[in-house]
Amino acid sequence: MATTKSFLILFFMILATTSSTCAKLEEMVTVLSIDGGGIKGIIPAIILEFLEGQLQEVDNNKDARLADYFDVIGGTSTGGLLTAMITTPNENNRPFAAAKDIVPFYLEHGPHIFNYSGSIIGPMYDGKYLLQVLQEKLGETRVHQALTEVAISSFDIKTNKPVIFTKSNLAKSPELDAKMYDICYSTAAAPIYFPPHYFITHTSNGDIYEFNLVDGGVATVGDPALLSLSVATRLAQEDPAFSSIKSLDYKQMLLLSLGTGTNSEFDKTYTAQEAAKWGPLRWMLAIQQMTNAASSYMTDYYISTVFQARHSQNNYLRVQENALTGTTTEMDDASEANMELLVQVGETLLKKPVSKDSPETYEEALKRFAKLLSDRKKLRANKASY
């Protein structure tokens, strides 16, 4: 209820902000948002691989990376992990993972991450392997070293408040300059599935600052697109490169939002008669699924309405599979067979139409989006050279 109320407040604030300014491509803010969904992160990973390949082709540069084109990359849960993989620098100050490396990461490590602990008390998975592999991959890198602005959400169960890790917040809140592996584990620590994560940083005065964090989906309910747009708006207001952008002027935003799939209309749905017999535990599991699905639909609805109201619907692309069935609906089924099915879902999704009203496929839409990103990057570079 509180989440819906906050969405509505932001929604009407956006609609109330009008602007007749025509956006200059070089001054537009580019935003990538990636949903949570556990092992279903394979689906957006396929999309990212395709998009990065298109950018490399358009710019004739095999070393082009997504972080070179987006001003803000935001994610929650598995989307936060993807965000870190494509923005955390290696020893050459380039993203340590190309988009094509992400699916192999899931295929190799997924079965070990989602390896049932066997305990009847506590979470289903102990999280030890997940934390270990994140430490190995991300090392000692901290938020301030990210190659572009990031927005990774989590929730502090001790303070009962969301915690959003961004570079732009560090001057005011240096305690947020945490290690990326701590952030990634925290945003993925879904209640029931993984233990909460405790770690410390230090304030500007050198005092210890404690975090007691769980999955970012608790804060953003699975879809971080509105969060990512909010961070982008603040970034635009503070950066002179975006001087023409007004507060909450989404007409000057380019947003790509990637989902991890929702269930088919008739898969894992329930009747009132069935639900009337449920106990607290059964409701707990069902509510998480229902809340994530509702969030995905409603966030997309709000954002679509805003962009359409600004006659800027081509500036927003939501890539989502809405017909998952069987094992592909599970966020923790990391069996080889299911992961291969998720790869197929992502590849098939590229060939599907963006909407029932348009023959344009996601593949075609992403090619168009890649051209916009490329042109904007070149215009920005030319402007900076004068």
From Swiss-Prot:
Its primary localisation, in coarse terms, equals other
The organs and tissues expressing this protein are described as:
Tuber.
Q: What positions belong to coiled-coil segments? A: 321-384
Q: What is its EC number?
A: 3.1.1.-
Map motif GXGXXG onto the chain: 36-41
Protein's cellular compartments: Vacuole
Q: Which UniProt keywords apply?
A: Coiled coil, Glycoprotein, Hydrolase, Lipid degradation, Lipid metabolism, Plant defense, Signal, Storage protein, Vacuole
A Gene Ontology cellular component where this protein is annotated is:
vacuole
Q: Coordinates of motif DGA/G in the sequence?
A: 215-217
Q: What else is known?
A: Patatin have a dual role as a somatic storage protein and as an enzyme involved in host resistance.
Name of the featured protein: Patatin group M-3
Q: Which organism is it from?
A: Solanum tuberosum
Taxonomic lineage is: Eukaryota, Viridiplantae, Streptophyta, Embryophyta, Tracheophyta
